[in-house]
């Protein structure tokens, strides 16, 4: 599937994906798109959608708008509809910062894009290629976490939840399907360590879904650490370039402010530009030898 292809993978992270928005805008700014395949997890799917749509700055501006609107995050709705109102997010996205789906489909000609989803019935991970007709529904489903959002979303008659629940960093899946050249954009910092003082651990205690999803949400951070350890242990012929913040980001999954989003976005923008510079420097060095 991914043999001889350059694969771009984006981790999710709620408002932490303002970092990813910065990286992707740096890529757009420098017309850097050598990728053959894209894999999106949770909010990473939104970043990829705007990137493929060639909507520079839209995801960043959308998050700035949402964090200032009390209708998006409501603590009073945590046990009924979820902390974050995803339907409101897509209403804002459509009206003020719309995707250009025709351009996105054009960008994917000869390429492939997979959205990571968790089947709400059995907790299994599924990897789907969106069509023009179901792109929005798949992206909503990919960001739907019990308690933090409404919990599940229907796509083609099947209930799905956030793919990050079951596979938050799908490098192993990519490698198992032939990938040897991967760029991973993370929202967890370089020295990430699991902690129980996190919203997803708290949320797991109130989930009434099947036991696998409950366990996966509770162990979400351990699964990220396992993925990082897996990457570190890969053989030399499998290349994984990681673009990640050096320290903990200012934003959290659902806690936010315009200042924090701007800081994380600028950190991502700088990280993206630095990565492109390093790629060009490496390419230039190879040409001279």
Task: Report each predicted region and the residues it spans.
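Catalytic nucleophile serine of serine hydrolases
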Residues: 42
